[in-house]
Amino acid sequence: FSPDCTWTIRNSGISQPVAIVSIEEVQFGYCRGYIKVFDGSGAQIFTREGCHENHSSNAFLEIAFQESQNVTIQVSLQNNQSYARVGYGILEDDLESASLLPAWNVAIENKT
């Protein structure tokens, strides 16, 4: 059992890539552990740690790749009762540049 994982999401050749990271569910057994997300310049743009943030609502992050052309996710799960569910995708440009489909009703509630 290795409690620490690091995933590096790399650009696959898309110009102006943006990563969409969805942190869907997090459980830290015995109040120990963390999940951190870093942009391509190494700046930490998201963190969740400890008991008071277990099973909290989804976090949906839009992250520019920057010069290094990657995004990094670090997870520390200190025991076998801990878990994190994370999904991601890579887009060309940001979500605001996407075209809306005429039949879809879209509302933006909160953008961070």
UniProtKB/Swiss-Prot annotation:
It comes from the Eukaryota. One of its GO terms (cellular component) is extracellular region. The keyword Secreted applies. Keywords: Secreted. The keyword Secreted applies. It is found in: Secreted. Component of the acid-insoluble and acid-soluble organic matrix of the aragonitic skeleton (at protein level). This is MAM and fibronectin type III domain-containing protein 2. It comes from Acropora millepora.
